[in-house]
Amino acid sequence: MDLKQYVSEVKDWPSAGVSFKDITTIMDNGEAYGYATDQIVEYAKEKNIDIVVGPEARGFIIGCPVAYSMGIGFAPVRKEGKLPREVIRYEYNLEYGTNVLTMHKDAIKPGQRVLITDDLLATGGTIEAAIKLVEQLGGIVVGIAFIIELKYLNGIDKIKDYDVMSLISYDE
């Protein structure tokens, strides 16, 4: 299935000059959403995954059905102040400022094999932060899966030491 046909491109959103890749048009088509989920599950099966991790919010949309299909758990990565129990945190730089992501301190057990999922790889900052959190807890990132990779933003450079799969890629 050509998933690219289900991606909506929204010009000049969220700011002028940006062509936003909207995956909600994959999600609202049961066949396309199911296909995307199944492709990631097939990728993950080879890796003996113990748990799926996804950053908010679209990482939840991708990771939860994958975890459910595999009969394993899902651990969220969230913005600071959104998780109720004791957390670990990772602060990283943005173009104009910083951002903080957190995970529950007990979300990953040392040695667990982890698949990280998200909707889109752009600059790689968010996924790099998720990797750092998983590894801080002793997890082993054995795969990273995206629906879309924006190759022209070179986010893959930040995660080049990991096994990464993307279902759709855009060169420009």
Swiss-Prot record:
This protein's UniProt keywords: Cytoplasm, Glycosyltransferase, Purine salvage, Transferase
The keyword Flavoprotein is assigned to this record: no
Function: Catalyzes a salvage reaction resulting in the formation of AMP, that is energically less costly than de novo synthesis.
Quaternary structure and interacting proteins, as annotated: Homodimer.
Family: Belongs to the purine/pyrimidine phosphoribosyltransferase family.
Protein species of origin: Staphylococcus epidermidis (strain ATCC 35984 / DSM 28319 / BCRC 17069 / CCUG 31568 / BM 3577 / RP62A)
Catalytic activity: AMP + diphosphate = 5-phospho-alpha-D-ribose 1-diphosphate + adenine
Alphabetized PANTHER family for the sequence: ADENINE PHOSPHORIBOSYLTRANSFERASE
The keyword Glycosyltransferase belongs to this UniProt entry's keyword annotation: yes
Protein name stated in the entry: Adenine phosphoribosyltransferase
InterPro entries reported in the protein's UniProt record: Ade_phspho_trans, PRibTrfase_dom, PRTase-like, UPRTase/APRTase
HAMAP family recorded: Aden_phosphoribosyltr
An example Gene Ontology CC term for this record: cytoplasm
EC number: 2.4.2.7
Pathway(s) served: Purine metabolism; AMP biosynthesis via salvage pathway; AMP from adenine: step 1/1
Example GO biological process: purine ribonucleoside salvage
Compartmental location: Cytoplasm
Molecular function GO labels: adenine binding; adenine phosphoribosyltransferase activity; AMP binding
